[in-house]
Every structure is written in structure tokens, then in C-alpha cells.
Amino acid sequence: MRKAKILATLGPASREPAVLESLLAAGANAVRINMSHGTQEEHTENIARARAAAARLKRPLSVLVDLSGPKIRTGVLKGGQPVQLESNAVFTLTTRSVAGDAREVSTNYAGLARDVRPGARILLDDGAIELTVESATETDVVTRVVNGGTLSERKGINLPGASLPIPSLTDKDRRDLQWAVREGADYIALSFVRRAEDCLEAKSLIKAAGGKQPLVAKIEKAEAIDHLEAIVEAADGLMVARGDLGVETSVELVPVYQKRIIEEANKKEKVVITATQMLQSMISEPRPTRAEASDVANAVWDGTDAVMLSAETASGKYPVLSVATMARIIDSAEAGRPASAQDGIAHQAGRKSGRVSRALCEAAAFAAEEIDARTIAVVTASGLMARRLSSLRPEQRIVALTPDRNVQNELSLVWGIETHLHAPCDNTEEMLKMCERTLVEAGIAQQKETVVLMAGRLSGLGLSSSVTLYTVGGPLPRKL
């Protein structure tokens, strides 16, 4: 079973029901709703279609809603057609409402002219185009094109090294967050996080809206790297957002930061997603480059929970093939993990947390190793015990059994966890029989096979943070 998960961004290329079903069948475990594009109404339909496709395939699905954040973007272009910016040409960014061309384009950031100085660098489209500021008026920033290229509509604008007086949560983000809670999203991602306080504010808004969604902090600013440990503590998960991170810092530092972010997330038992340009060439080509295949494999070896596809599945020519290709690369990477990569339990050993649940997870993982068990089954109401076990990266199959469909969907994004839904049980004996029946019917365990069985805190069932070795078809243990 593939352990690292695949998060696919939905868009025009992948929103049709037949394509969505093929996307999930090819290996997507979760879908991303990018609030930078489209309307709430369109995304409501996208979520409904994704849930329906998952239901037809009888599998869980995580839905991650990615808030736009205070992204500075270029505006529209004449006729919606891309323009070519030539090196050494003069190009103007303006707050005036204009249909852009090769001489000027509008921006959604009213404070741009105020916040730049002559000589400052401005990067467009994830750094593909570089400008240098020559002068500014109240509305216009006049620049010289250093590195030209093709500019399409609504592309990102980055000001490397600049600290802009912009809140992490915009008014649009607040509306979209409330919408995401109403739609039953499984995760909410916050863009352009700079400090832990940004995460705490977003989490308070989720709670106020009546939600319990885990918050994923997107690490894409230099300030976020400076405050990484505090952000990891405050957030429920992290995303290595390499596009903006590479232009806000420098491209050669992205691999260094990626490893550091993943390591910090693993240490704190937080889900972590590696994103941006993983199979970029498959937007237009049916095969990835060798470098892209190596990139995906290295993210897996670094310890990421999930790898993400962006334009590859949202607007590319080969959305389903991109997912299938990524799944094959992950399979190969996991089968051929080098000795230098993290080594499961040994990698996490010795990190004392003081938590009983952590100790039980380590005990279960070591017990499974000692008796050569193939499966660790986790009975969980909240998903917490399963997530903690996952953070140890055991070799064994992790099977989470939960009565809560929301928990089942949430765990679909977490490394190595296979989830099964079950009806609520009234007592310990009924729960044990349910576990055995589920494992056998799913083809996970056979008669007389010994599995490691864990239970989180399930009030009223006599199961409380426990571990037992259980032989399928054998006598039920009297007490866990």
C-alpha cells in the first residue's frame, strides 16, 4: 500500500464528474480547492462532485480549502491574451483600472507605489519575470524589465525582502473561511503566514464559525522561516509552498527549507504537505522530467505526509495521468528508500513527549516489529491516536477504524493511514468483533494472523488508551 498521499488541485481540467472519478481511481487521496480562482458557488459544486465521486468508489476523501491570502496580483489583459515583456523594456504597474498590454498592467495592491523604492526588485509569475523599480507616482510604479517573458492575467507579484503592512487574513479570506466550514471542508489552509498569531487568529475564526477543521499553515514567506517553531506549535499542519517561498527567499534555499519544515512537522506530529511544481512539465507533456521524478521521491524520503499537484491537475492537459505518474513515483520511492532517509521508528526514538498516547504508539510499533505483524489497527473516535502512530512512520500497515465519517475523511491525507468506517459499538466485545470482521472482509488480515490492536479513549466501552496483541479467529481478550 502506498503510504505518502496525493493532494490534487481541482480546476477546469478536473472538475467534470468522470474526470474526478478517474482522478481518485488513479490515486488521489485528497482534493484542494484553490480560493484564488473561481467563485464560492463553483467550488460548492466542485466539492459536491468530489464527494460524490469518492462515494461511488467507496473510499474516503479529504477536502482542503486553500484561502487566497493577501496575494498581490497583476490585473486583466486586453482580450485576456498573454503579452510578451522584452528585456530592457519599460513596464508600468499601476493601481489605475486598465486593460493591460506590453506597456502596463494593473495591480490589486493599492499600496504598491508607497511600499517600493527605486532599485527594488519586483518578481512576476513566481519569479519568471524580473523587474527593477525606476520611479513611482501615487498610482504608478515605473520599472525596467531585467528578465522578460510571457505574462498572463492575474499572476503573482512578489517583492523579495519587503515587509508589507498587509494582514494575513483578508476580508475575502474571512468570508471564504466561514463558507469552508459550512461546506464541511476537512482542512483549511492559510496563505502567507508570517507568525504564530496569524494561525491563532484563523483557528479562532474557525471555532467561532462552528468548525473543528485543522488549520494548515502555508510556509511561503521569509518571516515564516524566522518564526517556524512557533508556527508549527500553533498550526495543525504545514504546507511547504515552494512557489512563493522560492521568490520571497531564494531558489537555492528551497530544498534546505523543505527539509527543515518537514522535520519540524514530523517532530511535532503535524501533517505536512509538499507543494508546487512537482510535476510541472506534465501541464503540457505526458511525461515528467527526470528531475521532477527525483523531486517527488526526495519529498517522500524527507518524510512528507502528502505531495501536491497544482496546475498539473487544475488546468493541465493530463490531470489523471499526472496523478497516476505521481503514484508510481511514490511507490518506487517507498520500495527503494535509501539508508540515509529517515528510518521509521528509529528516526523518532528518544524524543520524549511525556504523553501516554505517544508511549502507547511507540509500544505498538515496537511490538509489531518484534512479532513481525503486518498490521496495526487503531480504533479511534477523534483520529488522534492514528495520527500519532503515523508520525512514527512504522513499516506496518496502519488501519484506522472510526465511527465518524469526518475523521475518516480527515485521516485520508495523513501518511500511511488506511481508514474504515464502522457502526457505533456498545461494548468492548462488540468492538473487538467489529475490528476482526472489518480486517478480514477488507482482506487486510487472515484467520490465525496476529495483529496489533490499539484503542484511543472511547468512553463507555472500557477501552482507554490501550494496546493488545490479537489473533484473528482466536479467543477475545478479556480486557485490553
Model regions and ranges:
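Non-catalytic helical/linker scaffolds that mediate oligomerization, partner binding
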Residues: 1-480
